[in-house]
Design a protein with these regions (language model features):
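Short strand-edge motifs at loop-to-beta-strand transitions and within beta-strands
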Residues: 76, 124-128, 398
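Bacterial N-terminal signal peptides
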Residues: 7-15
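Extracellular beta-strand elements of beta-rich domains used
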Residues: 89, 155-157
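Short, conserved beta-strand segments of beta-strand-rich sandwich/propeller modules, principally
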Residues: 88, 137-139
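Extracellular carbohydrate recognition and processing domains
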Residues: 113-131
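Disordered, acidic Ser/Thr/Pro-rich linker "stalks" and the adjacent N-terminal cap
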Residues: 21-86, 92-100, 104, 118-120
Length: 669
């Protein structure tokens, strides 16, 4: 079902050196060159996807510098079978210091030419941007160089946003990353998927936390970007890295030139380690392709201890399972905005290549050649006098070590569960049916195109369309499945409330019901609070993704079946008590009033909300409100409670419950 939305929103013109949205179409072209030194350096290497490798995967011309120092400058050309639209070319010189392609000219089949100067001599990208061109070929002629056998490591060619004809290419994930929260930017995530991975550049929760475009360093790649829940940071390295010194030591510089970020895909280059990191995802797994550009001793770190954006990891338990797999768990504490005091995360990490050895660390101690590890259990309050202080814990984790050669690739898959290690492995096995990274990326982005394409806009400027589809992408982030592929999920509602936290939790494992075809009736979700979503999210979901109000309603009612209360912002099967009132009521009522409620019984949903609108329920009202109709000294909460009562009255009326409709209708005035 497609909807055409006629109103578009404007965005100021901002240029991003990194690529958001569009695809590199150079691999679809045929490469020819004036000369090649040998078969290992022929023209086909210039668009093979191997970039910045030491003396490999590159076009090397046969041009020899004569004694009179006038090099016969070479050229290379890309031809497409049909006309394409281009707006950006990225050139990578050979990383070797013996030959430097310093400048040249780009010639296009439309008769235009663009001069290129200042190409870095270490393989760093040189970005050339221009007004969109319709062309059949592009040719780069060297006009300034040093040394013999100059060439290029790679040429990438990108169309402008929207030219790809899909919806993913309309999204620019970099927009507003300096303002958002930790889970505002998730490129390794499917719509409402369980795994949510992205590079971490600012280790804080709000005001530009998570991935921040203004950052110049990558701290790692966390696999969980949830509302008050984070964890399992992966970080590839090379050389001698002391992990006990933490992310401030193992971090790496990166550049936006050469970076690509899209829904379902992210690529960047770790400058300090010479590693290309590519990331995609399935519903319940993260997937990485690591390309090493030089011979090195490599370590793939898994950090399982310390503060991470919205929570603090500790009590790690890790076990090696053969030479391709690691399993374990860690606890998470310190949710700044409340929630279950402890959420245990189980994980499995699988490698396509056997690691040479597994090392570990806990606090300041390092271990070599281990089969298991117990991390630090120490927790300290960062600000002892603040009730909502973040917590700290020593870093702990393991590192899988490899001896790698130039051009080697290692693939890594991750999966989590909030129930058991066995379930995490089942999630991984169910989703990880191939090591073909490109196939998984295509499937991930096909799914994003289907979701984003539910609302198709026409007209306006490209900037307006980019802003619109980027906003749609954000609407589909921040809420994640917590149930496993077998239907099990954690119930953390049974405990003692302490302010905004739940302590002394009696953890239960529950199983979702299935329909006649064996599919779970609905999923359970971790979600940011639904406070004020009646003005935006409830309406937009109902228009574009009508299954989601139904899904969320069923999930919220099941939370109440487990713990009595309808959550405001559920966390891993428990409550956060964030904000005020019962903001789920307008969402659930809207699903019913629009005829979308299929996955839970409407009468049961109404009675559950009715209980939550009485003293002791999530609405948080007392006898004063029942007697006087307002919240003392709080006009805002009065309006909120009145609106929620009015919404509940509408559902009661449609259900034929005249007394209840009159009661809540009167309460709303």
């Amino acid at each position: 079902m497609k909807k055409e939305l006629l109103t578009l929103f404007c965005v100021a013109g901002i240029s991003f050196p990194a690529l958001g949205g569009t695809y590199n179409i150079a691999p679809k072209a045929r490469a020819t060159a004036s000369s090649s030194l040998n078969a290992d350096g022929d023209a086909s290497k210039v668009n093979d996807g191997y970039i910045r490798l030491d003396n490999a995967g590159e076009w090397v011309s046969a041009a020899q510098m004569p004694y009179w120092q006038q090099l016969p400058y070479p050229w290379i050309r890309l031809d497409w079978d049909e006309e394409v639209t281009l707006s950006r070319i990225v050139l990578y010189d050979r990383p070797t210091g013996d030959a430097h392609t310093a400048g040249g000219d780009l010639f296009f089949s439309d008769g235009t030419r663009i001069g290129v100067v200042g190409i870095p001599d270490n393989g760093e990208p040189k970005v050339v941007e221009f007004a969109p061109k319709r062309v059949r070929w592009v040719k780069f002629e060297v006009n300034d160089a040093v040394g013999s056998h100059v060439g290029l490591s790679e040429i990438e060619a990108f169309p402008p946003a929207g030219a790809g004809g899909d919806f993913v290419s309309q999204v620019n994930p970099f927009i507003e990353t300096t303002k958002g929260r930790y889970f505002f930017f998730i490129t390794g995530n499917q719509p409402f998927g369980m795994i949510g991975a992205a590079p971490l550049t600012r280790n804080r929760n709000q005001y530009g936390g998570g991935y921040n475009y203004n950052s110049t360093e990558v701290l790692g790649f966390p696999q969980i970007h949830n509302w008050v829940l984070a964890g399992l940071t992966l970080m590839p390295t090379t050389g001698n890295v002391d992990p006990t010194l933490g992310e401030g030591h193992w971090k790496s510089h990166f550049r936006h030139e050469g970076e690509i970020a899209q829904p379902g895909y992210h690529r960047l280059f770790l400058e300090d380690y010479g590693i290309w990191v590519e990331q995609t995802a399935t519903d319940r797994t993260g997937f990485y392709r690591l390309t090493f550009t030089r011979d090195a001793e490599a370590g793939i770190l898994l950090n399982l201890g310390g503060y991470l954006a919205s929570t603090t990891m500790c009590n790690a338990r890790v076990r090696r399972v053969g030479e391709h797999e690691i399993e374990g768990s860690f606890d998470t504490y310190g949710r700044h905005w409340g929630g279950p005091e402890n959420v245990r995360v189980y994980f499995v990490v699988r490698f396509d290549r056997p690691f040479d050895r597994l090392d570990g660390w806990a606090g300041t101690r390092r271990y070599s050649g281990i089969d298991s590890l117990e991390g630090s259990s120490e927790i300290t309050r960062r600000h002892p006098r603040e009730a909502l202080s973040y917590l700290d814990s020593p870093t702990s984790g393991v590192a899988a070590h490899y001896g790698v050669r130039t051009g080697d690739r290692i693939h890594v898959r991750t999966a989590v569960s909030y129930v058991s290690t066995e379930n995490a492995r089942e999630n991984l096995t169910h989703d990880a049916t191939t090591w073909d990274f490109d196939a998984v990326r295509r499937a991930a982005q096909d799914e994003w195109n289907e979701w984003l394409g539910r609302i198709e806009v026409k007209g306006g400027t490209q900037q307006q369309r980019t802003k619109f589809y980027t906003d749609l992408w954000h609407v589909l982030l921040g809420r994640h499945k917590i149930d496993d592929v077998n239907g099990e999920y954690p119930d953390l509602t049974d405990g003692q409330r302490a302010g905004s936290f739940t302590r002394d939790i009696r953890v239960k494992t529950r199983t979702l019901p299935r329909d006649a075809e064996g599919r779970v009736v609905h999923h359970m979700y971790n979600s940011d609070a639904f406070w004020l979503t009646q003005w935006n999210l409830n309406v937009l979901w109902g228009l574009g993704w009508p299954e989601m109000p139904d899904e969320m309603s069923a999930s919220l009612i099941r939370y109440a079946d487990n713990g009595g209360l309808i959550p405001r912002g559920p966390c891993a099967g428990g409550y956060t008590y964030i904000m005020s009132g019962c903001p789920a009521t307008p969402l659930i009522v809207s699903a019913y009033n629009k005829g979308l409620m299929r996955k839970c019984d409407p009468m049961h949903a109404f009675r559950t909300m009715q209980r939550n609108h009485m003293p002791g329920g999530m609405q948080g009202i007392g006898e004063f409100y029942l007697e006087h109709g307002y919240q003392p000294k709080n006009a805002g909460m009065t309006i909120e409670s009145n609106f929620q009562d009015w919404a509940l009255a509408q559902m009661a009326g449609r259900l034929g419950l005249e007394d209840e409709a009159a009661y809540f209708g009167n309460r709303s005035h």
